[in-house]
Amino acid sequence: MNGIAWMIVFCEIAFWVVIVLGLAVRYVFKRHTLGLLFLALTPVIDLILLAATGVDLYRGASATAAHGIAAVYIGISIAYGKQMIQWADEKFQYYVTKKGTKPLKRFGMDHAKHGAKGWLRHVLAYLIGAGLLAGMIYFINDSSRTEALSGILKLWTVIIGIDFLITASYFIWPKKEKASANLRS
């Protein structure tokens, strides 16, 4: 693995470490401001990855799949970051501190609408990541050095199309609530 691939691994681990630390400090130690400070570090992690990728390419490295995945990671992190923190917050409150409401399980049209919002968020992530990929391709201006970036962009375009089809299927075949054990007599 090259340095950018390791940087992606580091950033993903750092992302979840600062979230868990932020939630633990916030709810277990009752230090809300310090907890918020940890949670606010998540965009800094994205900036570190963006800077590392930019510096590597600026120094003349040929773009690899890792450089493309870095752009995807940043797009997803920006588009989904707040939602991922809210998800972790709900789970942490309910399962760790034993407070708050049980995380909601969605069914039927509620599940379909939630899936559609997720797909729109995926489109936002795609636009951010594709913009970064297109920017790298433009600034490098050497197709032999950017083949991997173009490949990542094409693959992500196919993936977003598949995600759309899956999301549309939720409206056609809504997710049904499973019958509970108490109702099966």
Swiss-Prot record:
Q: What is the lineage of its organism?
A: Bacteria, Bacillati, Bacillota, Bacilli, Bacillales
Cellular component, GO annotation: plasma membrane
Superkingdom of origin organism: Bacteria
Respond yes or no to whether keyword Transmembrane is given for this record. yes
Localization of this protein = Cell membrane
User: Which keywords fit this entry according to its UniProt record?
Assistant: Cell membrane, Membrane, Transmembrane, Transmembrane helix
Q: Does the keyword Membrane apply?
A: yes
Q: What is its main location?
A: membrane
Q: How does it sit in the membrane?
A: Multi-pass membrane protein
Stated name of the protein: Uncharacterized membrane protein YmcC
- The transmembrane segments are 4-24, 35-55, 60-80, 123-143, 152-172
Organism from which the protein derives? Bacillus subtilis (strain 168)
